[in-house]
């Protein structure tokens, strides 16, 4: 088990807030000394069902504000994010279990490769408006990150083992009272645990772990004028 303090980052690639939080955590891994970050794929659809939550995109007023909020947040962190025009149609038709199982296969082999593939899925969906739901989509993602046997990885992901791991991860998230993604569980050095939702709690996590407050690259290192 990774040493403490530790951040367990539960994510699903359908979630744009997971994308934003992922990119921020990738920067913080080099800035927050002594903090371990574990990236844990789970299935957001099951989390929403178990918690009784509904996707923001399915609530008209909330979906409008969500898109505005996403653009603001992505701009602040310098993350290229454009909601795909067919997003509503896609989330009604497809699930992300296939994508998440592919990531689990990669995670078994090479954590860094899994992280590159997860980023490619987010960029594909949230920057290029391309699907990430079917076998051919997965093959294209894997080729983009340099996997030499993409078809074999996709086929391996269909083994029952990986849906079991995915649901175990999902159930752990539900046990932590997760109701959306990303779900962030912080383990402090004294052994206590603290849960956070979303991509706008980094200042609280930094304070909890007594780490530097996170800033986008253009502001990192600047001193306050106050």
Swiss-Prot record:
Signal peptide region: none
Biological process annotations from GO: glutathione metabolic process; innate immune response
Protein name: Glutathione S-transferase kappa 1
GO cellular component: mitochondrion; peroxisome
EC numbers for this chain: 2.5.1.18
Binding site for glutathione: 15-17, 53, 199-200
GO molecular function: glutathione peroxidase activity; glutathione transferase activity
Top-rank taxon: Eukaryota
Catalytic reaction(s) noted: RX + glutathione = an S-substituted glutathione + a halide anion + H(+)
Entry similarity comment: Belongs to the GST superfamily. Kappa family.
InterPro entries, alphabetized: DSBA-like_thioredoxin_dom, GST_Kappa/NadH, GSTK, HCCAis_GSTk, Thioredoxin-like_sf
Enzyme class: transferase
Keyword terms: Transferase
């Amino acid at each position: 088990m990774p040493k403490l303090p530790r951040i367990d980052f539960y994510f699903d690639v359908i979630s744009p807030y997971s994308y934003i939080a992922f990119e921020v955590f990738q920067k913080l891994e080099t800035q927050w000394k002594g903090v371990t970050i574990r990236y844990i794929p789970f299935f957001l659809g099951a989390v929403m069902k178990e918690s009784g939550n509904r996707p923001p995109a399915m609530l008209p007023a909330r979906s409008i504000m969500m898109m505005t909020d996403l653009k603001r947040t992505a701009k602040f962190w310098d993350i290229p994010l454009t909601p795909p025009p067919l997003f509503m149609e896609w989330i009604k038709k497809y699930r992300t279990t296939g994508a998440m199982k592919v990531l689990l296969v990669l995670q078994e082999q090479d954590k860094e490769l899994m992280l590159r593939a997860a980023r490619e899925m987010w960029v594909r969906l949230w920057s290029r408006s391309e699907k990430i739901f079917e076998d051919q989509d997965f093959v294209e993602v894997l080729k983009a990150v340099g996997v030499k046997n993409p078809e074999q990885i996709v086929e391996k992901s269909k083994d029952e083992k990986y849906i079991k791991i995915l649901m175990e991860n999902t159930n752990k998230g539900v046990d932590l009272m997760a109701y959306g993604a990303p779900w962030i569980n912080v383990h402090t050095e004294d052994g206590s645990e603290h849960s956070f939702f979303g991509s706008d709690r980094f200042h609280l996590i930094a304070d909890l772990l007594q780490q530097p407050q996170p800033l986008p690259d253009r502001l990192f290192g600047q001193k306050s004028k106050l």
